[in-house]
Amino acid sequence: MNYRHSYHAGNFADVMKHVLLLQLLTRLNAKDKPYRYVDTHGGAGKYDLSTAEAQKSGEFLNGIHRLVKLDDSIKRNAPEGVRQYLKIVENMRENFGKGAYPGSPWFALEGMREIDRATIFEMQRDVFQQLRHNIFDKRAGLHERDAYEGLLAVIPPKEKRGLVMIDPPYELERKDFPQLVELLVAAYKKWPTGVFAVWYPIKDRAMIERFEKKMFKTGIRRQLICEVCVWPDDTP
């Protein structure tokens, strides 16, 4: 696997994913009973946007960088999810430096309560070691494991309620999307009361439309598509 999220951390797609993640957890927090959060591709848990990788891509400049540069008056009037997101980023930067940026596991643990639990997968050994170094929370169980088989082994959790964040690297999209549909069908069958959030890149609109049609044909209830496009579909 060649994918390294350190090149893409904090970009516009990360911003959208993390704001939505926090909003989903907020909804789960509305009920008293505990829940389980599962992250299938946890990554390093925390990133440094001052590294050569992040600086080389510069993707964060059109993501988190633009938000933190906004006037405080604009931030105060932003939607609740955006305010919560920015507060977590600001707190991390106060503790780890202005280049620090949280990964999905970090955002999730900040959005969860003490009674909730997390299961986080990461199969790349070097990235998993970074995850172990960065995430030291008693609520989180870390697994160096392929989530495509690991997810089905840990659901349904004893908490009954919960959220699964699925964010694979999509290195071979023609293979990854069909595999993702199969995973979701199997996971939903085991845990029909779970919430499954799937992140995917929009590089080939026709491929995305095929994926979405296949998902609707699965019969999985209450599907919602949330997309953000900052460039036209025909942009090279």
Predicted regions and their residues:
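Class I S-adenosyl-L-methionine-dependent methyltransferase catalytic core
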Residues: 1-236
